[in-house]
Structures are given as C-alpha cells and as structure tokens.
Amino acid sequence: MQDKYNHTEVERAAHAHWNANDAYRVTEDQAKPKFYACSMLPYPSGKLHMGHVRNYTINDMLTRSLRMKGHNVLMPMGWDAFGLPAENAALKNGVPPAQWTYDNIAYMKKQMQAMGLAIDWSREVATCDPDYYKWNQWLFLKMLDKGIAYRKTQVVNWDPVDQTVLANEQVIDGRGWRTGALVEKREIPGYYLKITDYAQELLDHVQIGNEKATLTGWPDKVRLMQENWIGKSAGVRFAFPHDIRNAAGERIQDGKLYVFTTRADTIMGVTFCAVAPEHPLAQHAAASNAPLAAFIEECKKGGTTEAELALKEKEGMPTGLFVTHPLTGEQVEVWVGNYVLMSYGDGAVMGVPAHDERDFAFALKYQLPIKQVVLVDGETFDFHQWQDWYGDKERGVTINSDNFSGLSYQDAVAAVAHALAEKGLGELKTTWRLRDWGISRQRYWGTPIPIIHCESCGAVPVPEKDLPVVLPQDLVPDGSGNPLAKCEAFLKVDCPCCGKPARRETDTMDTFVDSSWYFMRYCDPKNRDAMVAGGTDYWMRDQKAATGGSGMDQYIGGIEHAILHLLYARFWTKVMRDLGLVKVDEPFTKLLTQGMVLNHIYSRRTAKGAKDYFWPHDVEHVYDEAGKIVGAKLKNPAESGDGLLPVGTPIDYEGVGTMSKSKNNGVDPQQLIEKYGADTARLYTMFTAPPELTLEWNDAAVEGSYRFLRRVWNFGVKLSAIDKDAALASVAGAASLKDVQFGKEAKALRLEIHTVLKQVDYDYQRMQYNTVVSGAMKMINALEDFKATDSAGAQVALIEGFGILLRVLYPATPHIAHVLWDELGYAGTLGDLLDAAWPQVAPDALVQDELELMLQVNGKLRGAIRVAASADKAAIEQAALASEDFQKFAEGKAPKKVIIVPGRLVNVVV
C-alpha cells in the first residue's frame, strides 16, 4: 500500500469497488428488520452547499452503521425539481427551465457520488418527470371526487415579483418566502385542499401531552410549532344584530355581524367592532365613502397572514355604520381595520380595549371608549397605560357586567354563551387557525392542474386515461406572467364530456405538492401502473403496528420546514390512507432537524450606501486585549462597489450567520473535497458539533480532521509491515480470541479499545456522531501509544483494535476505511466492509487485572496507585501508604485515617 495518504487515489479505489458491486442497490427482504432513512430532497439549484453535506452525511452514517448491524436499509435520493428559480434562471439565461434543471441535477448528482453516499440511485426521482407528476394529478382528481379538493375565489397572498399566489405558510414577515417582496392582497379563483378536515387528527398526533400523540420521536420544538399553526381555539361565536340594508333593500348578511372570541367574559366591555377591508359591511360603506374606499385599497397592499399583520401598524377608519350589542342593546360603531383578515373566522372582531392589548392601542390612537369589565384583586386600572394583568383571565373577576358581574373566566363564558343561545344569537364553538391549502400557482414550471374549461360543461376533470397532462418542455419564460397561458399547443383541447373545443387550466400546483409524498415514490419508483404499491407497504410500514402508526423510520432536514413541508406531508399521507393507498397514519416516525452551518460575515458600506460582503479568506480579524474580535480588515485586495480595495482596508465584522451566497460566507464543498477529500469533509461536519446543533465553520479544524485521517493511514502502513495472517485468523472468530495469551500491555490496549467501543456503540444509537468521532480519536491514540508488538498476543490486540477502529470510522469516512480494510487483509477473513458485522464489545476485554486509584492526601489529589482488581481493603491501604506520592506529601506525619472509595480513589488523612 502507498506510504502516504492520497485521498484522491483512496476515494477513486473505493468508488470503483462500490460501483462494480452495485453496493447500495437494495430490495425488500422480509428476513431482516427494515430501516428507511431519508434526507429531505434538495432543490437542484446548481451546486451542493455545506448544509447538504452535513445533512446527507448524518443520513449516511445512520444507514451504514445499521447495515453493519444487520438491518435492510434504504437511503434514496431525488430532486424537488419544479419551482420558480428554474423559471427565473431560464428568463435570465434564455434556456428552457427543463434544460437548466436537468443540467443542475447531473452536476449535483456527481457531487453526491463524490461524497461516497450510500444512495440507491436506482430509486432516483425528479418531481418534474411526467412519470412522477402524473400521480400528483391522479391524486388531485381523487381528492376532487371525494370533495377534498375544490375551487373557490378568495383573497390571497400575491407575490408581485414572482407573479404568483403564495400560501399563508409561504409569507414570512409580510414578504414572499422566496423573493422577499412585500405581499399584496388579491381576489382570485383557485383550487384548494381541505386540510382543515384533518385538523383534529393532525393536532392529536403531534400535540405534546395528548394521549393520541404518535410523533414522540419528533423534536418538541417542531411539535409545538405545528400545534400553534393548527391553532385550536375554544370560544363563542355570536352576532351583533343590525338593520343595515343594501341597494336592493335587503339586510346585509341577514342583519347579523358575526364574530368569534375566546374572551366572551369581556363581552360587556365591547366599545367597537372591526371588520376586514373585504367584508360586505366595509364594501357597502365604501361605496358612498371615497376616503374609506381609498383606505381599503391601501389595505390590499399588505399580506394576508397573521404574522404579517402582527408586525404592521394597526390602522382603521370608521364606516359610519352601527350594530346592536346582543346583550345590552347599545349601538356599537363598526370600523374597518387593516389587522382583520377576511379569511379568518367571519372577517370581523369585537373590540374590547380594556382587556386586549391590540384593541387598547387602537382605542388610544382613535380616542375610542375603554370600559373595564375584569378586575384582578390588588390591581389598579390605568386608562392611559396597558398593563399585562388587563388580559389575565386566570385571576380576573368580571365587574361592570350587570348580571354577569362577580364571575370567574370559566363561569362568565358559560353564562354569556347561555344568554346568547337563549336569544338565538350565539353558541359555543371551536375554531382553527389552520386554513385550507391553496395549491393554484400562476406559473409555468410546475405540475399542470388536470382540469379542462368548457363553455358548455364548465370545469371538467381530465379523464384518468389521459394522464399525465404533460408540461411543454421547451417554453422559455419572458417575464410577463404564465407562459402556459400563451401556449396554444398546450391550451387547445376538446372537452371530454361534449367534444367541443375547450381550454386547459393554466395554473400549476404548488411545489409543496411534489414534496408531500416523494418519499413514498422512492419505495416503488418505476411503477407506471400505480402511485404506490408493495414496496411502499414494506418500507413505509410501522414495524410496531399491523396498521396505522408511522412509516419512515428516520427523516432528516432543516427546522425551516417545520410548518410548510412537514405539515403538508402529514396531511397528504392521511389522505392517501383514507383512499386505501397506504396503511400508516403518519409519514415519519422520527425526525432530526440538523443545525445550520455558520460562518463569519464581513461587510462594508459603499459611498452610495450599498452593502458589500467579503469572502472570509480575504479578511483577517482585529482583536482587543482580551482576545475578543472587535473588527476586521482586508488581507487581500478585494473588489467592491467603490472599486478595488487595498490590503488593510477596515471591514465591518457582523459575527457569524448561516452560510449564504448573498453574504459571500459560504464554503464550496467541491473545493473542499478536491483539496482534502470527501472523508475529511464528512468527518469535519460530524465531529465539530452534535447533529441537531449549529456548526460554526473553522478552517483550522478542517485541517485537524485531515491530519487525523493521515494518522489513521500511517498506522495502517505500520500494520502492513507485520505478519498479520495468524492475528487475523484469531480476530475472525471470538472463540479463537479466548485462546490468545495477552500480556499486560495488550490487555490494557484491549480494555481501552473495548471501553471506547461500548460508548461509541451507545453514541451511534443516539445519533451523537460528534462523540463517535471523539471515540475514534481515543482509539487511534491508544493504538499509537502501544509499543509491545513483539508477541502474538500483542499483534492480535493491534489487529483487533485497528479492525474495530476501521468499522467505527467506516460510516463517517467510508473511503479510507474501505481501502485500509482491504489492503490489510480484513476483507479476506471478516468479509467486505460493506456488510461486515458491527464489532461486539468483548466482556473478557473489560475485565481488569489491575485498577488505578487516585491518591489523595488530606483531600488533595497527589498521585495514583495501581492495585490488583481483587485487592481487599487492607491491601489497598498498604499500597497507598507505601507509595512514593504518599511518602512525599505526608511529610513524615502519621496517617490518622484511610478512606477508600471502591474503584475510584484512596484518601489518607494525616
């Protein structure tokens, strides 16, 4: 074997072996326990980033280690290939999105293969493949038939840059999740999926403390995020009667303004009502009120999510309309509020300024009445300053509430609900924050919605025999809306009902549809006759339940998908279950949300106020006296908006943040692999931090990982020079190891190796891969420190120890482990490392002939003594008093007492 570690040659040899043996192709095997582990499929943006490397290495370590432990493991990969970035890239480069997408897939696949990932590429899927999205269309039609999918017109989030509708979950702080553009409100028809029909089950399975919860293998943070998003609220829905009539003389909404509240105990404190800009009362008032109409138009510029509204300033305008308080008969003014959503509840809220912080601020701003109706003992109400106790329903008692005064929250709600019910104006009701999923997108590069619009027959589903409705592959967007709307070859079709000329639906499906079930398609990817089949039953089965339960054993991805993708995938799975396609209730048994990869961020404002970002390799830190980073400066000339900046130019240090192209703080995995090798990249990302925590990039630590692998290689070279045949034969069988005569040093080595192995095995089970690597480092230290190599027992201990190290390292650094395993002859006796058995802790190796005990004198550590493992108290005491360390630190004083902590220490009091 080569004397020096050459990562390029090592990795080439490993890949050749794996490719020749089709190493990672897997089939169903009922004789083995199955384990399905999957990373969230990537968008083919062009290149992998370090977050990908970390995610996929975590998955790879898991599947490789379990394969060694006898599991039938599946690690597939695919591409979330539809989406707006492809259209934008096509617009920029003048090429069809399909070409851009497939070119990127080819490059990123090569990068993944270079990483040595144990992916079964025979199961690869791309969501832009008609053979894949045919089943999106097929299931959509099944949902349409069952009433789960439907069409309606509704106020939606409109991204003015991407010219498309966004789901609520895709609006972050009032901006589009992809473009960052301020979202607008628009009324537009589209298709929706009734995820709300599954709200209770979605909540039950994820809710912490719920006896029906099944997702106990998910992080609590993710479970809580989903629970809050689903948002179950118990309260009272009631009406404010009115006699407001439209131009035809009819009462608007039958003369009732409905609201929902969880604080019915404060109903006697209502001083105004607020309605959404789209509410019928608002529209009626605006018809004869120009300033109000202008205000409503201004409101449409905001987004339609609670998160967006929570951040914006609360504004309103009176309508001049009044409704009647259902219990007091008082007239209550109706306002239009920019913070009220038509899509939530009835599009109206009651205003109780005294006991709602938002209403309090609104009332102060517009000088509206504030009426206190809840009192907390010992507190004083201030009409000019909000205090937290104003909204305290646990300690509060109702006041100024006529017959409802003196009641606790629970009693007041019950009494108010009863009074409203008697008047026919209200009832107890449960509401949900979750809204139906709008899947229509006014874009080209997505799954065509399989609907045909006929002037005679209306919206007609595409017949199943005509699926898939294939997306044209050669269109190039020009930036002016959806290209499908201008593609006559796609648009023109005969109505399947009447045969007359008709037009296809030009909206495409939200790309989150594609990612809601791809993990099931991996199980049976080539099936042209069914969406899922027997392979899905095998891989997506809960091994602890005959039916129901959860499917995939381990799912890995970022916490940024906690609401969007993960909630949709859960819903999609339940729909497929109800259609008889799968047997599980939930898609993912366990979820790991890996931490982000961080790096330093450096910037500088240009003369025009723009911000330039600089690559870390062009910058050096400036430190204060305490060694803290206080700034930075250029160590290489760098381009900026002000031209070429010279060495020494001061640069702002922004701390660490997620690696990002826009901030020039990313690390190219390809360059890392070329310089150090895939094993170094993998090892570094696993060693630096536990999988669930953030990883802060450190170039010096990358060098350290590379040096460690050189040490492992060099030790392998050392072993190659000795006669290993007899030792390998002994290591190959546990029984023959019992016949080996191990000397004192060899026993000590085996004790260290097997002690570390025991901990490493536990760490693998916990997926604490950083401490797995730490354990491997302890093993190489012990092997390097071992000097007695002249006996048969010593050689067996070395060969056994290094063989254990290679198997421990193999899931993390498979290339170097494979080559050393082969070169040193382990494959000939223990089999190919691909399927070599996981090393077992040898009980006899953990038996100690001697113990090392810490020696204290008057409670202070002064040294150590070694005694026989069988030594009794008298022998230990004698050894302690006779030791040089005791004699030195006792300073001639006689011992008064000897305290022995078995197996740990001896304390001599003088």
Curated annotation (Swiss-Prot):
PROSITE patterns, A to Z: AA_TRNA_LIGASE_I
- Report keywords, A-Z: Aminoacyl-tRNA synthetase, ATP-binding, Cytoplasm, Ligase, Nucleotide-binding, Protein biosynthesis
A Pfam family matched by this chain, by name? tRNA-synt_1
Q: What is this protein's record name?
A: Leucine--tRNA ligase
Task: Name the chemical reaction catalysed here.
Answer: tRNA(Leu) + L-leucine + ATP = L-leucyl-tRNA(Leu) + AMP + diphosphate
Q: Which gene encodes it?
A: leuS
- MF (Gene Ontology): aminoacyl-tRNA deacylase activity; ATP binding; leucine-tRNA ligase activity
Q: Cite the InterPro entries for this sequence.
A: aa-tRNA-synth_I_CS, aa-tRNA-synth_Ia, Leu-tRNA-ligase, Leu_tRNA-synth_edit, M/V/L/I-tRNA-synth_anticd-bd, Methionyl/Leucyl_tRNA_Synth, Rossmann-like_a/b/a_fold, tRNAsynth_Ia_anticodon-bd
Question: What domain of life is recorded for the organism?
Answer: Bacteria
- Motif stretch ('HIGH' region): 42-52
Q: Which residues bind ATP?
A: K661
For this entry, list what GO says about its biological process. leucyl-tRNA aminoacylation
Chain coiled-coil ranges: none
Query: Where is the protein situated, by its record's location annotation?
Result: Cytoplasm
Any idea of its EC number?
Answer: 6.1.1.4
Instruction: Report the Gene3D superfamilies cross-referenced here.
Output: 2.20.28.290, 3.10.20.590, HUPs (3.40.50.620), Isoleucyl-tRNA Synthetase, Domain 1 (1.10.730.10)
- Gene Ontology CC terms, in alphabetical order: cytosol
Q: What is the lineage of its organism?
A: Bacteria, Pseudomonadati, Pseudomonadota, Betaproteobacteria, Burkholderiales
Q: Does the keyword 4Fe-4S apply?
A: no
